[in-house]
Structures are given as structure tokens and as C-alpha cells.
A protein has these predicted regions:
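Long, C-terminal-biased catalytic regions of enzyme "large/alpha" subunits
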Residues: 1-202
């Protein structure tokens, strides 16, 4: 990353143009390239080698993110990503896929405050999972069958910048969704000290 920043700055001086070092979303490419690579090189390492050997769709870990099943400890992941994410000059975001069934506005506010007071990442999203039942509408959490009437539900989660039905994602992204560890916002990492600092806003 430091090398790419240096090269980018050299190009800026040489051309007079302004360039960004961006974390590309690669939402489709992570699956497409893994699929092509595994067809040509069956032993190549993907993000999900065990599941792939058992017939699951292959995919690569996106950009410089940690593997989706690395940890459910939000503060451990924030600490590991903080230095990397701040090296980009644009187009970067860390999605926090929360395992809480129903995060209150106050809990979200407190989490954002804790993150912005202790980390330097430029962009984060709090990304819950929810479901839509044809009869009962919005259902908090991941339910492929409605907990009230057992009807088929559409499960929504974030892909790129949008909340979309998981069943419309490509096979690799659907496998990533299955593999993903959701963050437990109540889990305080033993490896990370997060201070409660005074905030300038309330």
C-alpha cells in the first residue's frame, strides 16, 4: 500500500492530475475471478477452500479486508483494519455486519461514537440483516421462512452500497454471506483497549 501511494504521488507530480488510491468493491469480480482461476488451477487457494472442495462456489476476499469469517470481535477487526483503511485516498469503507437482532438507535449511536473516538477509519457502515415476509412485511434478522406464518421470506443484506435480496446475489456472494461471521457489538476484545472518551457531540 505504501509503495502504491508513492507511485501514485509520482504520477501526480509527473502529469499534474489528481489520482485516488481506492479500495475497489470487486463484488462481482471476487467470484468471477475465483471461478475462472479454479477452473484453470483447481488447487489455487480461494477464501473458502474447504467449502469449495465440497462443492460450494469459490470467491476471493475483497480488496484488503479480512476474510469474512475471521472474527466476530468488532474491535479486533477495527484495530487490524485501521492502519490499512487509512492508507487509501478514496473509495474505502468497512462494513460492520451486526449480529444483533435489533440494534436500537441509542446502541448504534454509542457504537459509532466509540469507533470515531478510538479509530481513524474514514468510512464505516452498520449493516444489519433483515427479512421481508409477503404477509407480515419487515422482520428483524435473517429468516428465510417467516417466524409467524412460515411463508418464504426475502432476506436482505448489504452488497456494495445497497441493501439487496441475498437470493439475487451471484453464487460467490451468496457463499460469502453463508460464511460471514456477524459482529457481536457487546464483545470487547481482550487484545484491544477501547477508551470511553468525551465526545464533542451528543
Amino acid at each position: 500500500m505504501d509503495f502504491m501511494r508513492t507511485v501514485l504521488e509520482d504520477f501526480q507530480e509527473e502529469t499534474g492530475n489528481i489520482y485516488n488510491l481506492e479500495a475497489t468493491p470487486a463484488e462481482s469480480a471476487a467470484y468471477r475471478f475465483a471461478k475462472i482461476d479454479t477452473e484453470q488451477y483447481p488447487d489455487i487457494i480461494t477464501a473458502n477452500p474447504e467449502a469449495f472442495r465440497e462443492g460450494a462456489a469459490p470467491y476471493y476476499t475483497n480488496s484488503t479486508h479480512l476474510p469474512v469469517n475471521y472474527s466476530d470481535d468488532i474491535f479486533e477487526v477495527l484495530t487490524l483494519q485501521d492502519e490499512l483503511q487509512t492508507k487509501y485516498t478514496g473509495g474505502t469503507v468497512l462494513h460492520l455486519f451486526t449480529g444483533e437482532k435489533n440494534m436500537s438507535g441509542l446502541a448504534a449511536k454509542n457504537l459509532i461514537r466509540k469507533i470515531t473516538n478510538n479509530f481513524r477509519l474514514p468510512y464505516i457502515t452498520i449493516s444489519p440483516t433483515f427479512s421481508i415476509c409477503p404477509s407480515h412485511g419487515y422482520v428483524v434478522g435473517e429468516y428465510f421462512a417467516c417466524p409467524k406464518c412460515d411463508a418464504d421470506c426475502e432476506v436482505y443484506s448489504r452488497i456494495v452500497g445497497y441493501m439487496r435480496p441475498v437470493n439475487q446475489w451471484n453464487n460467490g456472494k451468496q457463499q460469502e454471506f453463508k460464511d460471514r461471521k456477524l459482529f457481536n457489538i457487546n464483545k470487547q476484545s481482550k487484545k484491544v483497549v477501547v477508551e470511553e472518551k468525551e465526545s464533542t457531540f451528543s
